[in-house]
Amino acid sequence: MSMTRTLGGAAALAILAAPVAAPVAATEADWRQSFESFNIGLLGGENEADRLRRYDCMQDLVSDALGVPVELFPAADYAGVMQGLLAGQLHMAGLGASGYAGIYLQDPEAVEPVLTTAQIDGGLGYYAVMYVRADSDIMTFEDLEGHSLAYADPNSASGYLFPRGQLRMQGIIDDEFFSRTGFGGGHEQSVIAVLNGQYDAGVTWTSLQGEYEEGYTRGNLRRMVDNGLLDMNDIRIVWESDIIPNGPTVVRQDLPEEARELLLEFLTGMKDAHPDCYALTAGGEAGGYVPIDHAFYEGTIELRRQELQGSR
């Protein structure tokens, strides 16, 4: 049995208030009896219908692997999933590097990063890009001065933390360089806002591998092309970030060990055993899940810590 619920954001976590048995209290022999369901959070940034369509196959496969019902919780924004994990009401989620850093800075004992997705060439990083409409007179990053910029989400690595931080390291203060900045409501929503003329430029994530016309091999641009929401000829990329660590799949640290082992066994074999489902959930072409740990994100955590200190 599998179900789907919706998280409307951090405040909407009240819908999860029905008791969810605490995994920490379960023994290895009875942990399944303690689970009403295994709850997977789905990050915002893509319209809910497409998110649920992409993850529908994984929902049933994880349920089969663990032997418990699985529920999907699509959130309106990154914060909804982060708060669900912190509250112990979600057991697993795929996060961006900045989202994990945000959770760690609030509670280092809440979740553990266990896997990340390799790119098709085996690399463990991706890029933020700034884009404009193809019919714009903005041809370079320098031309963006005095124009408006849409960030994706305040908890996004590629859609906020890294591009803003990298510009600041180059002496560019975004609030001074751009005429205005704002949040588009997610990666997909920001692209649409730029195409509709609400902002002059936006920021999103991509592998920068493969064919430009296809939206590269993986990332928000690829998902939008695949879903018929974007023609790459309608935008122009004018800036690329340094490499950003691929985001982790995290699990609650109090997840029973047997559940953790079964989950990791399924996920690490998913690309070979269920390639079509893997491609859907990966958002394009990717190299499979590979083990990762906290150390991979220490630089991101420090960058996020500095961002938090600078905002006080």
Could you say what each language-model-derived stretch is?
Residues 10-19:
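Bacterial N-terminal signal peptides
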Residues 27-42, 46-57, 251-312:
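An extracytoplasmic/periplasmic, membrane-proximal ligand-sensing/linker region
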Residues 35, 40-65, 75, 98, ...:
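Bilobed "Venus flytrap"/periplasmic-binding protein-like clamshell domains
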Residues 43-44, 127-138, 239-257:
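A bilobed periplasmic-binding-protein/Venus flytrap-type ligand-binding module shared by bacterial periplasmic
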Residues 73-110, 211:
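Pocket-flanking alpha-helical
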Residues 110-123, 234-240:
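A structural signal for short loop-to-beta-strand junctions that line the ligand-binding cleft
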Residues 148-150, 154-256:
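Pocket-lining segment of extracytoplasmic ligand-binding domains
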